[in-house]
Amino acid sequence: MSDYKLKNVCDFDLAQTLECGQCFHFVKLDEEDYVLAAKGHVLHVSQEDDTVTFYDTEEDEYVNVWKDYFDMDRDYSAIKKKLLEKDDKLKDAIESMWGVRILNQDFFETLISFIISQNKQIPHIKKIVSDISAKFGTYKGTYGGVDMYLSLIHI
């Protein structure tokens, strides 16, 4: 299986998107290198500047799964511009988190993550999600030394 490279990506920062607290079923392998489970797949993904590499991912998997998951068809530049026209108080937030995209996650995983997130911090939530997946999920392989299981929706 080959790698799929997405070049000239705008308004996307992989680290900001994954680590902002909207998803928890991922492991950071390196500075810009992650493995995550979502939509019935395990993805090893990294970003260097404006190029995102989806390892062991064919183009059809990117188009059918990850393009929607990472909301890559949406024009975030236009959204940010419109927000700033209406309220310049958002400028600092937009500038500091310029690369966050809204992930299109499975409803059940989002719901369970929200329920267990009450009064907890991100590292603890990630551990709980990982433990639940390891106990009840289907093993998908080892990536970067980390055992990965299917997303909670597939339990």
Predicted features, each with a name:
Residues 1-153:
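HhH-family (HhH-GPD) DNA N-glycosylase catalytic core used in base-excision repair
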